[in-house]
Amino acid sequence: SGFLKRSESDYDVIGAGHASTSISAGLGIAEARRQLNEDYRVASIIGDGSMTGGLAFEGINNAGHLGKQFLVILNDNEMSISPNVGALSSYFTRLISNPLYNRVRNEFWDLTGKLPIAKSQTRTLIKKVEESLKGLIVPGILFDELGFRYFGPIDGHDLDMVISTLENIKDIQNPVLLHILTKKGKGMVSLNMKNREYHEDAIKFHAVKPNGKAAAPEKIKRKVIKETPVPSFQDVFGKLSCEIARNRNDTVCITAAMREGTGLVPYSKEFPDRYYDVGIAEGHGVTFASGLAAQGVRPIAAIYSTFLQRAYDHIIHDCAIQHLPVIFCMDRSGIAGEDGPTHHGSLDIAYLRCVQDMIVTAPKNGNEFRHLLYTALNINDKPFSIRYPKASAVLFDETGQMELLPIGSWETCKQGSDIAILAVGPMVYTALDVAKKMNDLGVSVEVVNCRFIKPMDIACLENIRSRFSRIITIEEGIINGGFGDGVSGWLLEAGFAGQLKRLGLPDTFVEHGSRDQILSILGLDSDGLLKTIQDMVDDKKEVHNF
């Protein structure tokens, strides 16, 4: 795994994949230590980017309130060390972290508590003097006010300095924050660049690919997957966002620290005043978008499917209940690839289908993405979500006319008479490929593009129910609560007595690997769908298969 994973290493004390969690998790571990009367040190390391997430400050606030021994190391790698400030702060950190200084400080503090008069005034004066001295040199007053002893900033590449500071502060019985400054990619030639150039290069290392034979089962290794020249859904979104902005002045784009990943770099450069990166704060991003929508602005929130989970309450209470037309472009829905189980967008269909008034869609290609986004901008009284994978968009013509699609409308891509496949998103092309192969075997397969996951096309469903005794649903999302569940529920109530097979992600956390590898293993590629159809054809029983 490219992230912390408890099952992989004893040194991964707790799993992680989403940002801003280390302080809260570390505090829980520290309190477990106290509850179990055990003796060890706990240190939570957090990056400066993760400090944009509210969860980090929730943890800091709680730790400061508890006031027990706990160390937070803030790794700040977005700023260089000024020689003057670095020297001053290093000296000051050595001073205030020195055990002798802290012992004298604590004894003097206790002594002032015994003063017969002016005890509180004296202590307040001492605290203000120390804070003023810190304020001249270090940015630590905020953490002091939250109940932490602040040390730093120090050079994180000066190993001797880091070790001596840790030795000095390890026995302090209160919460401590050590601020270290580092340079991202230091020592790696390709990353020793400045500003955005090196940041964009470093972003490539966010997804750590599986290593060696363990990542390539025999049934996968023999397959050669060729890269296609067509744009990705992320490329398409980048172009669409700019196209829409040129034609509509009331639109803005929002992302949560994923400008490059979502394809919003061109938009951010062409429309900087209409581009908002809210940081690792998805909940804030959704409520922020709701505020914009409440005043007539049309916000398009481009957020990874897995990260949008963090904003679920905000989607319901700040957006859907208030009938606000926020557009959610859910990037990396389905299999996210090498980032693994913490990043697969497997749950969005299930967790959005149950939100009242939410429209849930999935384009089969870039052109349909264009039409769905245009349609979303014409909905003024409810949220509209568009899910798409990290994959090729198959077809995209940015010169054609945008079409307004009827809400809840499906599209029959191929007529058939023996089996009906109801496919979601790019799975339509998998279904069409298999339909052609089955046609050569004498089995007629109908393929329906279910671009509207919610609301469903009830007229089309009724037509399918009346004409077919074998139906397959296929989606790149979890089966439980997914599109197939919606179809099976409707068919059951409508009295369907044939066979229904739901294909999707299983009720387990899917491990990492390339999208093609994982889809093959899960039976969601052409070979897997072909086998499902053949098994269904061989099974002569006309029974429910829910």
Locations of regions flagged by a protein language model:
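Cofactor-binding active-site loop characterized by glycine-rich and histidine/acidic residues
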Residues: 1-66, 251, 255-256, 264-265
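Long, well-ordered, tryptophan-enriched scaffold segments
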Residues: 77-236
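A short, small-residue-rich loop immediately preceding and capping a beta-strand
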Residues: 12-15, 38-53, 70-73, 251-254, ...
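Peripheral docking tails and interdomain loops at the edges
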Residues: 212-227, 337-339, 359, 478, ...
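A glycine-rich helix N-cap at a beta->alpha junction
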Residues: 65-79, 320-332
